[in-house]
Amino acid sequence: MALPLLELEERGDWEGLISRLRDMVADDRTVLGDPLVKQWLGRRWRNLFIAEATRDEKALEVASRPVGLVPVKRPPLLPDHKSPQQRIAERFLKGDTVTDWHTELPPPDMPEVRNTTMVIAPGLLTGLLNEFAYAFLHEAPVVQEEFGWPIIRSDLHPFRGCDANHDDLVATLDRGEGFDAAMQPITDPTPPDKVILVGYSKGAPDVLTFLAANPEYADRVVAMFSWAGANGGSYTADNIYATIKDLDISSATERMRELLSLLNPGVVTDGMLRRLDEYDVVGAFESLTTEARLAFLRRESPTLNALGIPFFTVSGATSPLEVPNFQLADTLSLQKYDANNDMQLLQSQARLDTVEMSTHLAVLHGHHWDIAYPPFPRQMQLLSPNLDNPFPKRAALVAMWQLTGELGLVE
């Protein structure tokens, strides 16, 4: 099916390849399940990300720093002679794909966006780790303002099971309710037409369970991005669930601060807790156990594949020296299974390989919070290193839009 694309790639006819693939997708989206097409999709997204990140002066400065515990600038007497593309790729990508910067691909062929909205589905603990702990908090409004691409956020509850959050997704998709790109409540909601769904962490299984249970929404979903999504569950969630599953948590108001402080000492404040009567700590962690998530994938992968939605997954990878000190134990524990974990998930857990229409786009060099959240408040950074979260999230968000647009999926 993808042989014409392979011939175009061998000739270096990148514009012809992009145009031909767009035509093929228009005829039959299942072409995105072809292994050769998946290779191109990953390569193209990484190229778009690298190109956009080179426009980010902060990202280039971070990419030029010597690797170490303390973020220091490169001394002027030791200039970095690598190209901007090489610096970005080697700092923010992992694995063999860091060599993608070698090939110069054409700029994105992005159509005008008229009827497509990006909907961000947040993860567990959203807004609870600190007052700024929202995925793409600063980047989403900047991208919307710069390019005119609409972005809203579903008000998924930060601490209850996946199925329970379906009503929150309905509120966003059917009524346009939730938050705007800058995390301000939407006061005059308008239901979106076509949507790009971006699920971060637990937000990804929230979205997947919703789509499996409500396939009638598939025609409105042009693509779904799983951003460090806990699709296969989490060993960390397994351990926490085993500890709390028999606790009497009848009063979320009384126990919430105590439980959250175990996850991130001294971070949560009472004023950050919303929708207290809806908290279900046990249900939240149970839905993230490897048993629950793998059972879901075994049962529902055929359903998800039949929806015809292109699924894209992106994972993170870090090392023990690059995580906050209170996440070190979990990172070391996960290293027994996968040295390239993101401090909360293994690579296999962040992928969606049981769904043929799913493509893994990239392994990013950053821990689970770095690739989504802005820097933690200064007082928290004084207590632990590796909370500055320098990953170029704006470039990643732009590349998601550009890939989807170039494939002819947006309207």
What residue spans do the PLM features occupy?
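Flexible, membrane-associating and regulatory peripheral segments of lipid-active enzymes
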Residues: 1-133, 142, 411
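C-terminal catalytic-base region of ester-bond hydrolases, centering on the histidine
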Residues: 2-38, 55, 301-411
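Glycine-rich His-Gly loop
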Residues: 121-126, 200-201, 229, 316
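Short, flexible/disordered intra-domain loops and linkers
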Residues: 126-135, 242, 334, 383
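Serine-dependent carboxylesterase/thioesterase catalytic core
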Residues: 167-289
